[in-house]
């Protein structure tokens, strides 16, 4: 009796990575979301390995340099002055305090330091301190990122001249769902700021938040918008909604965690050379789901015990997970995608 052979079954033959010039229609992105889960993850991992070390993850630390009192009415945000969340508005931090936090982040293993301010846009009086923060953090050998709201051309250029590596300005969601979350800033406002950032020579960090009550098609609409930016973002943070008490999205039903993993995979396939970052809401994922996110192509995460005003898994727990998975922390230079 002959020994039975084991057949190896591969997913249907489809291109692993689309040409860089491809326009991602929403229907095309929906089709990715609707692939069988194993096929989607397999394809995303193939794309990931074409461009990155599959076992390297960049650690980023995010510091709120100006908390609360924001003029915008973003429905997910505890820092909006429109919502009663009990968060007290604070002034912009002193430069020395920011640099102390950056030193601590570096000592804890971070290679990227992000500074966030709860503003509609920075005022001119803030720019000297902001540029000093950028220069000081860069002198520590850390990659720098800021998120300060909308920018004017001159402000973007000032930050570029100071050496800012990345500017974060998220699209948040699809154009169709956007009006259900925010009314004080238009979608075009966000796109205009991204243009100013890119024109100033700063790398673009742009992603969104999922789990706000949007449909799968609307999630696909967000990914389509991001992937069709010219060029697509260098860094793509994917946030899982943290439904904060006192915000309009309080009580929103949690997103199926496998849908979050699917979103990571679709982002990797459609933006193959971008750094895909696990951001807010990571504490809602257990170790197994976080491992799936890395398998799906996430290669950066926010690291530390707090993200702006929401909690984040403890640093020691993160290090233990890395050890169990054989993942190593990567510096900024190593996160450049292969051609």
Swiss-Prot record:
Domain Radical SAM core: 55-282
Entry keywords, A to Z: 2Fe-2S, 4Fe-4S, Biotin biosynthesis, Iron, Iron-sulfur, Metal-binding, S-adenosyl-L-methionine, Transferase
Cystine bridges: none
Known cofactor(s): [4Fe-4S] cluster; [2Fe-2S] cluster
Enzyme Commission number, as recorded: 2.8.1.6
Record: residues binding [2Fe-2S] cluster: 114, 145, 205, 277
One family name in Pfam for this protein: BATS
Keyword Ion transport among UniProt keywords: no
SMART domains: BATS, Elp3
Binding site for [4Fe-4S] cluster: 70, 74, 77
Family: Belongs to the radical SAM superfamily. Biotin synthase family.
Function summary: Catalyzes the conversion of dethiobiotin (DTB) to biotin by the insertion of a sulfur atom into dethiobiotin via a radical-based mechanism.
Protein's name according to its UniProt entry: Biotin synthase
The organism of origin for this protein: Burkholderia ambifaria (strain ATCC BAA-244 / DSM 16087 / CCUG 44356 / LMG 19182 / AMMD) (Burkholderia cepacia (strain AMMD))
